[in-house]
Amino acid sequence: MEHYLSLLLKAIFVENMALAFFLGMCTFLAISKKIEAATGLGIAVVVVLTVTVPVNNLLYNTILREGALDWAGLPNVDLSFLGLLTYIGVIAAIVQIMEMVLDKYIPALYAALGVFLPLITVNCAILGASLFMVERDYTFGESLVYGFGAGVGWALAIIALAGIREKLKYSDVPNGLRGLGITFITVGLMSLGFMSFSGISL
């Protein structure tokens, strides 16, 4: 249990997808103008990561990795070269299901997210989590915890940035830094703040 808690905290704070690895920056910067939209996208990313990382773990360990098809009488087959294609396919399917659910039950959030909802499919933070899972050889349980933690970390970062950007609207920002300029500086300072967690031994 302690191991899983350590993995969760590490995924949220120490190895934050947005502020440590700078993954998913396209949607991170575009949707962080309002807290409501940022929260909606953050929740969507948490759900997608929590589902896709363990599903991709199952596919990798039962079909793709070398020797995984031993149960089918094919012990020397290595399909790991299909990993990238498989992970993207799983992510696309989950995002498509989520898009249909939001369109039907929460149309306001669906409209607020707009084109960025289907873009979660190619969000490198989503794909990056699955690739990290394979690289670190996580078990199914570890993948589930890591996927959830990575999603929560990314959501925490985008919601925090949205809150700061809403406050910045009322600040006297120099003309040359308005818009993305001050946002990049803000993200950099947030990243420096999150670096303090790297000194914690988990």
From Swiss-Prot:
This is Na(+)-translocating NADH-quinone reductase subunit E. It comes from Marinobacter nauticus (strain ATCC 700491 / DSM 11845 / VT8). PANTHER family: INTEGRAL MEMBRANE PROTEIN OF SOXR-REDUCING COMPLEX, NA(+)-TRANSLOCATING NADH-QUINONE REDUCTASE SUBUNIT E. Composed of six subunits; NqrA, NqrB, NqrC, NqrD, NqrE and NqrF. It comes from the Bacteria. GO terms for biological process: respiratory electron transport chain; sodium ion transport. It catalyses: a ubiquinone + n Na(+)(in) + NADH + H(+) = a ubiquinol + n Na(+)(out) + NAD(+). InterPro entries: NqrDE/RnfAE (IPR003667), NqrDE/RnfAE_oxidrdctase (IPR050133), NqrE (IPR010967).
